[in-house]
Amino acid sequence: ESTSSAEASSKESKADTAAIDADGVFTVGFDQDFPPMGFVDDNGEFTGFDLELAAEVAKRLGMEIKYQPIAWDAKEMEIESGNIDVIWNGFTITGRENDYTWSKPYMENKQVFVVSKDSGITKVEELKGKKVEVQADSSGEKALAENKELSDSFAELITTADYNTAFQDLEMGATDAVAMDIIVAGYQLKKRGDGKYIILEDEPIATEEYGIGFKKGNTALRDAVDATLVEMAADGTLKSVSEKWFDTDVTTIK
Protein backbone atom coordinates (compact mmCIF):
# COMPACT_ATOMS: atom_id res chain seq x y z
CA GLU A 1 0.00 0.00 0.00
CA SER A 2 2.79 2.41 0.92
CA THR A 3 4.61 1.58 -2.34
CA SER A 4 1.56 2.31 -4.49
CA SER A 5 1.00 5.52 -2.52
CA ALA A 6 4.59 6.60 -3.18
CA GLU A 7 4.23 5.74 -6.87
CA ALA A 8 1.02 7.76 -7.09
CA SER A 9 2.72 10.68 -5.37
CA SER A 10 5.64 10.45 -7.80
CA LYS A 11 3.30 10.38 -10.83
CA GLU A 12 1.43 13.42 -9.52
CA SER A 13 4.75 15.20 -9.01
CA LYS A 14 5.77 14.46 -12.60
CA ALA A 15 2.45 15.77 -13.91
CA ASP A 16 2.82 18.98 -11.91
CA THR A 17 6.39 19.43 -13.12
CA ALA A 18 5.47 18.93 -16.77
CA ALA A 19 2.77 21.56 -16.37
CA ILE A 20 5.10 24.13 -14.86
CA ASP A 21 8.38 23.38 -16.70
CA ALA A 22 7.76 22.44 -20.31
CA ASP A 23 11.42 21.99 -21.28
CA GLY A 24 11.87 19.21 -18.74
CA VAL A 25 15.09 20.72 -17.38
CA PHE A 26 15.56 21.34 -13.66
CA THR A 27 18.02 24.26 -13.51
CA VAL A 28 19.64 24.67 -10.11
CA GLY A 29 21.29 27.99 -9.25
CA PHE A 30 24.16 27.76 -6.76
CA ASP A 31 27.34 29.41 -5.52
CA GLN A 32 30.16 27.22 -6.84
CA ASP A 33 32.47 28.27 -3.99
CA PHE A 34 30.29 27.01 -1.14
CA PRO A 35 31.50 23.54 -0.10
CA PRO A 36 30.12 21.13 0.95
CA MET A 37 26.74 22.34 -0.38
CA GLY A 38 27.84 23.12 -3.95
CA PHE A 39 31.35 23.48 -5.38
CA VAL A 40 33.85 22.40 -8.03
CA ASP A 41 35.79 19.24 -7.12
CA ASP A 42 39.41 18.40 -7.96
CA ASN A 43 38.31 16.98 -11.32
CA GLY A 44 36.55 20.21 -12.29
CA GLU A 45 33.09 18.68 -11.76
CA PHE A 46 30.21 20.29 -9.88
CA THR A 47 29.42 18.39 -6.70
CA GLY A 48 28.14 18.85 -3.16
CA PHE A 49 25.44 17.79 -0.73
CA ASP A 50 22.73 20.07 -2.13
CA LEU A 51 23.63 19.29 -5.74
CA GLU A 52 23.47 15.56 -5.07
CA LEU A 53 20.01 15.95 -3.53
CA ALA A 54 18.90 18.12 -6.46
CA ALA A 55 20.09 15.51 -8.99
CA GLU A 56 18.11 12.78 -7.23
CA VAL A 57 14.99 14.97 -7.14
CA ALA A 58 15.32 15.71 -10.87
CA LYS A 59 15.78 12.01 -11.63
CA ARG A 60 12.65 11.05 -9.69
CA LEU A 61 10.67 13.80 -11.42
CA GLY A 62 11.82 12.59 -14.84
CA MET A 63 13.71 15.82 -15.50
CA GLU A 64 17.19 16.60 -16.75
CA ILE A 65 19.41 18.25 -14.13
CA LYS A 66 21.35 21.40 -15.03
CA TYR A 67 23.77 23.02 -12.57
CA GLN A 68 23.99 26.78 -13.10
CA PRO A 69 26.68 28.63 -11.10
CA ILE A 70 25.54 32.14 -10.16
CA ALA A 71 26.96 35.19 -8.43
CA TRP A 72 25.37 34.96 -4.99
CA ASP A 73 24.46 38.65 -4.90
CA ALA A 74 22.62 38.23 -8.26
CA LYS A 75 20.48 35.26 -7.20
CA GLU A 76 17.20 37.18 -7.08
CA MET A 77 17.69 38.51 -10.61
CA GLU A 78 18.62 35.02 -11.87
CA ILE A 79 15.42 33.43 -10.56
CA GLU A 80 13.15 36.33 -11.53
CA SER A 81 14.47 36.26 -15.10
CA GLY A 82 13.88 32.51 -15.40
CA ASN A 83 17.57 31.67 -15.88
CA ILE A 84 17.23 29.19 -13.01
CA ASP A 85 14.30 27.24 -11.55
CA VAL A 86 15.54 27.09 -7.96
CA ILE A 87 18.19 28.41 -5.60
CA TRP A 88 19.47 25.32 -3.80
CA ASN A 89 22.74 25.91 -2.00
CA GLY A 90 22.68 26.28 1.77
CA PHE A 91 19.96 28.89 1.27
CA THR A 92 18.61 30.38 4.48
CA ILE A 93 14.86 30.93 4.76
CA THR A 94 15.11 33.15 7.84
CA GLY A 95 14.79 36.81 6.87
CA ARG A 96 13.79 35.97 3.28
CA GLU A 97 10.37 34.43 3.98
CA ASN A 98 8.51 36.79 1.64
CA ASP A 99 11.10 36.99 -1.13
CA TYR A 100 10.58 33.52 -2.62
CA THR A 101 8.19 30.59 -2.69
CA TRP A 102 9.88 28.16 -0.30
CA SER A 103 10.17 24.42 0.09
CA LYS A 104 9.81 22.80 3.48
CA PRO A 105 12.93 23.41 5.59
CA TYR A 106 15.32 20.47 5.21
CA MET A 107 18.20 21.48 7.51
CA GLU A 108 18.87 23.58 10.60
CA ASN A 109 21.87 25.88 10.72
CA LYS A 110 23.63 28.47 12.88
CA GLN A 111 25.78 31.47 11.99
CA VAL A 112 29.09 31.33 13.87
CA PHE A 113 32.62 32.73 13.85
CA VAL A 114 35.76 30.84 12.82
CA VAL A 115 39.16 31.98 14.12
CA SER A 116 42.73 30.73 13.93
CA LYS A 117 43.51 28.43 16.85
CA ASP A 118 46.72 30.33 17.63
CA SER A 119 44.89 33.69 17.73
CA GLY A 120 44.08 33.26 21.42
CA ILE A 121 40.44 34.14 20.73
CA THR A 122 38.07 31.68 22.42
CA LYS A 123 34.86 33.70 22.91
CA VAL A 124 32.74 35.94 20.71
CA GLU A 125 33.18 38.88 23.10
CA GLU A 126 36.93 38.75 22.38
CA LEU A 127 36.28 39.84 18.79
CA LYS A 128 35.86 43.41 20.04
CA GLY A 129 38.33 45.61 18.16
CA LYS A 130 39.10 42.84 15.66
CA LYS A 131 38.68 42.53 11.88
CA VAL A 132 35.84 40.22 10.83
CA GLU A 133 35.11 38.96 7.31
CA VAL A 134 31.80 37.73 5.86
CA GLN A 135 30.47 36.79 2.41
CA ALA A 136 28.59 39.58 0.63
CA ASP A 137 24.80 39.19 0.64
CA SER A 138 25.03 36.09 2.84
CA SER A 139 22.96 35.11 5.86
CA GLY A 140 25.98 35.89 8.00
CA GLU A 141 26.13 39.46 6.69
CA LYS A 142 22.40 39.89 7.27
CA ALA A 143 22.63 38.50 10.81
CA LEU A 144 25.47 40.87 11.66
CA ALA A 145 23.57 43.83 10.17
CA GLU A 146 20.72 43.00 12.54
CA ASN A 147 23.07 42.72 15.53
CA LYS A 148 24.49 46.23 15.47
CA GLU A 149 25.84 46.05 19.00
CA LEU A 150 28.04 43.12 18.02
CA SER A 151 29.10 44.32 14.56
CA ASP A 152 29.81 47.86 15.80
CA SER A 153 32.26 46.39 18.32
CA PHE A 154 34.52 45.14 15.52
CA ALA A 155 37.40 47.26 14.29
CA GLU A 156 36.21 46.48 10.76
CA LEU A 157 33.62 44.29 9.03
CA ILE A 158 34.86 43.23 5.60
CA THR A 159 32.78 41.60 2.87
CA THR A 160 34.25 39.08 0.44
CA ALA A 161 32.95 37.28 -2.64
CA ASP A 162 33.41 33.74 -1.27
CA TYR A 163 34.64 31.77 1.73
CA ASN A 164 37.75 30.38 0.06
CA THR A 165 39.03 33.95 -0.09
CA ALA A 166 37.96 34.52 3.51
CA PHE A 167 39.97 31.51 4.71
CA GLN A 168 43.00 32.69 2.74
CA ASP A 169 42.70 36.07 4.49
CA LEU A 170 42.37 34.32 7.85
CA GLU A 171 45.46 32.23 7.18
CA MET A 172 47.50 35.28 6.13
CA GLY A 173 46.33 37.31 9.13
CA ALA A 174 44.46 39.83 6.97
CA THR A 175 41.36 39.18 9.10
CA ASP A 176 40.83 37.87 12.63
CA ALA A 177 37.58 35.96 12.17
CA VAL A 178 35.14 34.76 9.53
CA ALA A 179 31.36 34.74 10.10
CA MET A 180 29.71 31.79 8.36
CA ASP A 181 27.29 28.84 8.45
CA ILE A 182 28.29 26.22 11.04
CA ILE A 183 27.55 23.40 8.56
CA VAL A 184 30.01 24.87 6.07
CA ALA A 185 32.50 25.82 8.79
CA GLY A 186 32.62 22.23 10.05
CA TYR A 187 33.33 20.94 6.56
CA GLN A 188 36.01 23.56 5.92
CA LEU A 189 37.80 22.76 9.19
CA LYS A 190 37.71 19.03 8.47
CA LYS A 191 39.00 19.57 4.93
CA ARG A 192 41.79 21.92 5.96
CA GLY A 193 42.83 19.70 8.88
CA ASP A 194 45.76 20.24 11.23
CA GLY A 195 43.50 21.85 13.86
CA LYS A 196 44.48 25.30 12.59
CA TYR A 197 41.03 26.81 13.13
CA ILE A 198 38.29 26.69 15.76
CA ILE A 199 34.59 27.55 15.77
CA LEU A 200 33.35 29.94 18.46
CA GLU A 201 30.17 28.19 19.55
CA ASP A 202 29.58 30.01 22.84
CA GLU A 203 27.29 32.58 21.23
CA PRO A 204 25.83 31.88 17.74
CA ILE A 205 25.10 35.03 15.73
CA ALA A 206 21.79 33.53 14.57
CA THR A 207 19.88 30.25 14.28
CA GLU A 208 18.10 29.53 11.02
CA GLU A 209 16.75 26.95 8.57
CA TYR A 210 17.82 25.99 5.05
CA GLY A 211 15.25 25.68 2.28
CA ILE A 212 14.97 25.65 -1.51
CA GLY A 213 13.93 28.97 -3.05
CA PHE A 214 11.57 29.11 -6.05
CA LYS A 215 10.30 32.11 -8.00
CA LYS A 216 7.35 33.62 -6.14
CA GLY A 217 4.18 31.87 -7.17
CA ASN A 218 5.84 28.75 -8.57
CA THR A 219 3.93 26.48 -6.21
CA ALA A 220 3.50 23.58 -8.66
CA LEU A 221 7.24 22.94 -8.96
CA ARG A 222 7.70 23.61 -5.24
CA ASP A 223 5.02 21.05 -4.36
CA ALA A 224 6.57 18.47 -6.70
CA VAL A 225 10.01 18.94 -5.13
CA ASP A 226 8.58 18.85 -1.59
CA ALA A 227 6.73 15.60 -2.30
CA THR A 228 9.90 14.06 -3.71
CA LEU A 229 11.97 15.08 -0.68
CA VAL A 230 9.40 13.47 1.63
CA GLU A 231 9.73 10.31 -0.49
CA MET A 232 13.52 10.47 -0.16
CA ALA A 233 13.26 10.88 3.61
CA ALA A 234 10.94 7.87 3.85
CA ASP A 235 13.18 5.55 1.81
CA GLY A 236 16.40 6.61 3.57
CA THR A 237 17.98 8.52 0.68
CA LEU A 238 18.25 11.83 2.56
CA LYS A 239 19.92 10.05 5.47
CA SER A 240 22.45 8.21 3.29
CA VAL A 241 23.43 11.31 1.28
CA SER A 242 23.74 13.32 4.50
CA GLU A 243 25.96 10.69 6.13
CA LYS A 244 28.18 10.69 3.03
CA TRP A 245 28.88 14.41 3.39
CA PHE A 246 28.59 15.05 7.14
CA ASP A 247 29.06 11.61 8.79
CA THR A 248 25.64 12.11 10.39
CA ASP A 249 22.05 12.81 9.35
CA VAL A 250 21.61 16.59 9.42
CA THR A 251 18.28 16.63 7.56
CA THR A 252 14.98 17.56 9.23
CA ILE A 253 12.33 16.35 6.76
CA LYS A 254 10.21 13.50 8.14
Where are these regions (language model features)?
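Extracytoplasmic small-molecule ligand-binding "clamshell" domains
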Residues: 12-90, 224, 235
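Short, low-complexity disordered leader/linker segments with a strong preference
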Residues: 1-25, 250-254
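Periplasmic-binding protein-like
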Residues: 32, 108-115, 182, 186, ...
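Bilobed "Venus flytrap"/periplasmic-binding protein-like clamshell domains
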Residues: 32-35, 46-59, 91, 112-164, ...
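Acidic, polar ligand-binding/catalytic clefts
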Residues: 55, 59, 64-126, 203-204
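A ligand-binding cleft/hinge motif common to bilobed small-molecule-binding domains
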Residues: 74, 90-99, 143-148, 171-172, ...
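Extended ligand-binding regions for polar small-molecule ligands
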Residues: 52-60, 131, 136-138, 211-248
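Short helix-initiation/N-cap motifs at beta->coil->alpha
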Residues: 51, 66-77, 157-172, 208
